[in-house]
Structure formats: C-alpha cells, structure tokens
C-alpha cells in the first residue's frame, strides 16, 4: 500500500497525512513532509489539520442524531427553528439544507469575517434565492451554517459541544473540534500557499473564543487527525454513534449534483455508484489545505488524506486535482488485496 501512495505523492513533495483502513484494521497510517517548516516539525498521523468541507458530514451526522433522539424532524420547515422567515423561504426545510436544494446562495461573506450567529441568520434570510426551494441542487456553505444554528437551537448547547458529546466522545475522538481539544500550537499544521509561504494555522486568522465566526461554522473549519477519522469510520461501522436507520438516511443518494451526472448528494456526503460498489466521499479545501475522506460502503474500506500545502507553483502540481487519482489507486489496491484473502 505504501508503494501505491508513494507513486502518487512521492515526486510531488507532498506534505500531509494518509490513512487507509479495511474494516477496523488500519492498513496504512503515515505522515509526509513538514507540519511546520520553520520549526522543522514533521507531519504524523497525530498532526491536527483543517478538514475544510469534510466538516459537513459531521454537521449532517449531528442533524440525523438529533432526529434519532426525537429532537427534530428533517422535514421541519426552517421557520420552526429560525423564527419568522421571508415569504420566499417559508417552504425551505431542514432536509433541503442538508441536500443543498434550499436554493440559497453559497455564502454571505468571507470565511474570516467577524459574523455572529444572529447576523448570519439575518443575512442568509435576506439574500435572494438562486432557485425555488426543492427544485435544484446548488452547493451552499451558508445552508450548512444554518444547520449549525438549528443544531444549537434543538440541542440547547453549542454546535461544537453537541458534536463532542454525541458524536466524538462515543467514537473516542479526542482530537477533533474547533477549540475544545485545546491543542498546543506545535500540534497543528501550518498551512502554506502555492509559493510555499506560510499562511499560519487556522486559528491565526480571525477566530472567536469558541471557534471560527459564523460564515465558516458548521460548513467547514473543524480540525482533526487521521487517527480520529479512523475512529469515526469504526464508529460508523459498528453503529456506535448512529443506528442503521440514521445511517441509511445519511448515505442515501437524494439529488444529482448535476443533470445527467453520476454523482449524487446525500446528507453531507457525495455518493457514487462505482465498479467496487457504492462510495461515499467529501472533500474540503481553501487553496492552502485540502482534505479528502472516502468510504466504500459495504466493503468497510476507508481512505483519508489531508495536506497543508494543496498547490505548488514551483512544482507545478495541484493536489486538489490529483486527489481523486490517489484515492482511486488506493481503493483499487485494497479491493484487489481483499479478493486474495
């Protein structure tokens, strides 16, 4: 397996972590390159990285957990949780936020703008719709931030504390969150741009006391480790966090990402029907960091990789574009090796 990964990343000065699991067994777990060039700290499977939009599948899991607990219904109109909404948005449901079919705009400001929860809701509800709710898929980060608001309203606690209590703690994930893990700075990867210049750590940018401001909260920005993502995979396999019904809801293909395309969106996951079976995946990045989480449903396979330098002008590479090839190569090797067992 190491040879497969090396064939994709070895010549590209890859900096990050790769973890591959078959069922509950970790097949490969390795760090590459530097987490911090200045301090000469190497990346390891314990290094904390920004997950980007891989955060969305945790937000979706929190929503179906709340439904499992009887605290909300995904068919609830958002007005049940956000209060009065403009006439054009009265038909929007929680489920439409989950599937990016609410017709909302992608964002209502920059990720690092100091936007409070109240102002996020005000801006999101005031923004014109792209399409009539329920009629088309339009990826919306603001929709997932609204889900984080709904999670807080339905749970009576903060978004991060609910995830920590109901998802991360049962899965034995101690290194995932915004601020609750209280990491040392040296444990978190520094991000680098395409020129190799430091862009700091996620919390070196405008950051509230409890995590990122609300243009990012719920749709991105969680930090985690490869080891914790493996624990999440195991928790899904043994239904420790979400029961079978909840997981069927999570991984059901619901809306095509594009007309005539072969990829569908479920709740926080992109779903594909492939030669090795149904695949669920999501990626996330900001031009500096990039993460990709893939699960082959029914086979118990998982591939996670993350980098703190997604692109290189000097090297002429873009790992956001190469990521699918890396994941596909690893999955093919996993399936082939499983067939020989």
Describe each PLM feature range.
Residues 1-30, 152-157, 161-165, 169, ...:
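Catalytic loop of the DD-peptidase/beta-lactamase superfamily, centered on the K-T-G motif
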Residues 11, 35, 69, 100, ...:
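Generic structural signal for alpha-helix termini and adjacent loop/cap motifs
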Residues 118-130, 198-214:
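The feature captures the short pre-catalytic strand/loop hairpin that immediately precedes
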